[in-house]
Amino acid sequence: MIEQDRIIDANAKSREEQIDRAVRPKSLKEYIGQPVVREQMEIFIGAAQARGDSLDHTLVFGPPGLGKTTLANIIAAEMGADLKSTSGPVLEKAGDLAALMTNLEPGDVLFIDEIHRLSPVVEEILYPAMEDFQLDIMIGEGPAARSIKLELPPFTLVGATTRAGLLTSPLRDRFGIVQRLEFYNIEDLTHIVERSASLMGVAMDTPGAREVAKRSRGTPRIANRLLRRVRDYAEVKSDGTVTAQIADLALNMLNVDEHGFDHMDRRLLLTLIEKFGGGPVGVDSLAAAISEERDTIEDVLEPYLIQQGFIMRTPRGRMATQLAYQHFGLNVPAALKQDSLPGI
């Protein structure tokens, strides 16, 4: 896929998890941004510890790269528990989940990434495990098959997903805590970049960190990736210190503009404007026009463009906004100007 080569792709690339782990916060005190989530989790974790209970099962959702795995690690660390990690696509059979859960110790945190991709068979097994800490397993086949119940120790399930709408109601309803991660503001991202630079031994001033933050699409994973590339540029083209000017030169070289857009974003916006007259246009037609999959547009490209006000999602399809036209120095259609007038 084309977007896998994007430096601003919010999904983790191969080997990147190991690199990111080195700069990942280990506690809520180190956790930057997401103030509502941080405050709520401090209360929920503190209360569970005071009672001597496991934390309620927790669902974390939001766009990729915002720290869902990081939050799962922090929950385990704050609870003084071990973290066992897996993902929805890996758990193909009921036996896969049973093998994992029978090895849990009291208080353990089980993290299932991409939980929306669990198979229905595995999901059915998960219900009694979450609700009653029991595992129903079928032994044998055919008429001789019988069900046995296994008692599980109290544990906390942390589920992560980028597509909460795909979760079934029975699964979603079994989570006592539901947290949505939002895109980060520039101030918080600047602090994240400065912290990562310090841990990586990169000489960087605050204006340099802010320049990287501005182009990181509100996403810490992208910020850390851009930081590594800017560091490389500074070491080869300068004295190794990342200033605003060095960051600007490096990011321009990488074709990441002042809004954090790359060639894919610009292509999507220009296709919407030039081929479809600014819209509205259906997402399938848009996907065909740029030779991408529908899921790529909905999960990778659109969220940030919508959040920044460059695209509108309407019942009739996607539409380019005034900001999109202005970004490319194009004349804004009269209809868009009229729609934006007060009282219209």
UniProtKB/Swiss-Prot annotation:
Region described as Large ATPase domain (RuvB-L): spans on this chain: 4-184
Subcellular location: Cytoplasm
Keywords linked to the UniProt accession: ATP-binding, Cytoplasm, DNA damage, DNA recombination, DNA repair, DNA-binding, Hydrolase, Nucleotide-binding
Enzyme class of the recorded protein, top EC level: hydrolase
Residue segments, region Small ATPAse domain (RuvB-S): 185-255
E.C. designation(s): 3.6.4.-
Annotated residues for binding of Mg(2+): 69
Binding positions (DNA): 294, 313, 318
Region (Head domain (RuvB-H)): 258-344
Reactions that this protein is recorded to catalyse: ATP + H2O = ADP + phosphate + H(+)
CDD domains per the UniProt record, alphabetical: AAA (cd00009)
Biological processes annotated in GO: DNA recombination; DNA repair
Family: Belongs to the RuvB family.
Protein role: The RuvA-RuvB-RuvC complex processes Holliday junction (HJ) DNA during genetic recombination and DNA repair, while the RuvA-RuvB complex plays an important role in the rescue of blocked DNA replication forks via replication fork reversal (RFR). RuvA specifically binds to HJ cruciform DNA, conferring on it an open structure. The RuvB hexamer acts as an ATP-dependent pump, pulling dsDNA into and through the RuvAB complex. RuvB forms 2 homohexamers on either side of HJ DNA bound by 1 or 2 RuvA tetramers; 4 subunits per hexamer contact DNA at a time.
Subunit (UniProt): Homohexamer. Forms an RuvA(8)-RuvB(12)-Holliday junction (HJ) complex. HJ DNA is sandwiched between 2 RuvA tetramers; dsDNA enters through RuvA and exits via RuvB. An RuvB hexamer assembles on each DNA strand where it exits the tetramer. Each RuvB hexamer is contacted by two RuvA subunits (via domain III) on 2 adjacent RuvB subunits; this complex drives branch migration. In the full resolvosome a probable DNA-RuvA(4)-RuvB(12)-RuvC(2) complex forms which resolves the HJ.
HAMAP family (alphabetical): DNA_HJ_migration_RuvB
Free-text comment about domains: Has 3 domains, the large (RuvB-L) and small ATPase (RuvB-S) domains and the C-terminal head (RuvB-H) domain. The head domain binds DNA, while the ATPase domains jointly bind ATP, ADP or are empty depending on the state of the subunit in the translocation cycle. During a single DNA translocation step the structure of each domain remains the same, but their relative positions change.
Protein name, UniProt field: Holliday junction branch migration complex subunit RuvB
Species for this entry: Saccharophagus degradans (strain 2-40 / ATCC 43961 / DSM 17024)
